[in-house]
Amino acid sequence: IFWNDEEIEPKKTLNIPVVIMAGGLGTRLYPYTKILPKPLIPIGEIPIVEHIMNRFNQYISNEFFLVVNHKKNMIKAYFNEIEKNYKVNYVNEEEPLGTGGGLSLLKGKIVSTFILSNCDILIEEDYEKIYNFHKKENNLITMVCSLKNIKIPYGVIEIGKTGEIEEMREKPELSFFTNTGMYIVEPKVINELEDNKAIGFPDIIEKYKQNG
């Protein structure tokens, strides 16, 4: 499913645990992440990950699991000091394991449907609607996607195998879905992961696709 830019009114009728992957090095934000871990990079007066958690708390969740690694003590110190209306659990990742490997550390800790999110994306959407869609479709994993439109500022030429022009399009506009980094996931996915094995979440999705 995908999200758009409509403003959503808060309503909390569910309480779903949220797992946030907060252990990455944040290399794309260097040199800022030389000082701060990516989750604590401020947006306005508070860190990006706190924005994310506040929004989930406002709509759908009172409990969070932060998978931490890089500069994890700074993240723990921050959330241990602030006033908050939700519970924060820390899952220590001793070495980089990717999203899938990090989730394997949650075996026995999550026994119900949960939300999985990156630590640097804020989704403005009706989370309950996404959850209900996930349950209605009986999915193991539901990926939240964003529809993007990009206009190419040039004429686009499609060339055949022998070099002949097959089609010309002047400044076409392309539409495609992108992965937002937010998912609804069943606990079965955690239980079936190999312990402490580095694996990305797209690889996990592909495995389930191949297995039908």
What label would you give each PLM region?
Residues 22, 68, 118, 145-146:
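Short beta-strand/turn micro-motifs composed of small residues
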Residues 158-164:
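Short acidic-glycine loop/turn motifs at beta-strand connectors
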Residues 137-147:
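A short, conserved acidic/glycine-rich loop-to-beta-strand motif
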